[in-house]
Curated annotation (Swiss-Prot):
UniProt similarity note: Belongs to the BamE family.
Tagged with keyword Transcription: no
Protein name according to UniProt: Outer membrane protein assembly factor BamE
Sites of N-palmitoyl cysteine lipidation: 20
Transmembrane segments: none
Localization of this protein: Cell outer membrane
Name of the encoding gene: bamE
Organism: Vibrio cholerae serotype O1 (strain ATCC 39315 / El Tor Inaba N16961)
GO molecular function: protein-macromolecule adaptor activity
Covalent lipid sites (S-diacylglycerol cysteine): 20
Length: 119
């Protein structure tokens, strides 16, 4: 009788203590993409002096434009693939008071031809 109690209690205790963490990898998780997908090829198309409409045409609408700083646009992309750690990429685009592109910062460097300007 004593053996039967241990035979039932031990597996239950091990399962409760592990919290099913061993089985977590067996459960399928979908890939989650959120925000504005931006790649280096798109950033390379940006030129110094582009208008806001031209930048919006190349990159799409920004994820965030702060109320107090309408000349700074934020493009944020967040990707979680299955059980892997999430990856976040940021691109910050700044305009001058006239609405012309003056700076690109973040995880993507400006292209080599950025300072050639718009023709």
């Amino acid at each position: 009788m004593q053996f039967t109690k241990w035979f039932i209690a031990l597996p239950l205790a091990v399962t409760a203590l592990s919290g099913c963490s061993l089985l977590e990898r067996l459960v399928y998780r979908i890939d989650i993409n959120q925000g504005n997908y931006v790649d280096q090829q798109s950033v390379d198309q940006l030129k110094f002096g582009m208008s806001k409409d031209q930048v919006r045409f190349v990159l799409g609408s920004p994820m965030l434009v702060e109320n107090g700083y309408p000349d700074t646009w934020y493009y944020i992309y967040h990707h979680t693939q299955g059980h892997n750690d999430p990856v976040q990429k940021n691109l910050i685009v700044k305009f001058n008071d006239g609405g012309k592109l003056v700076n690109v910062a973040g995880d993507f460097p400006a292209g080599d031809s950025f300072f050639e300007g718009v023709n």
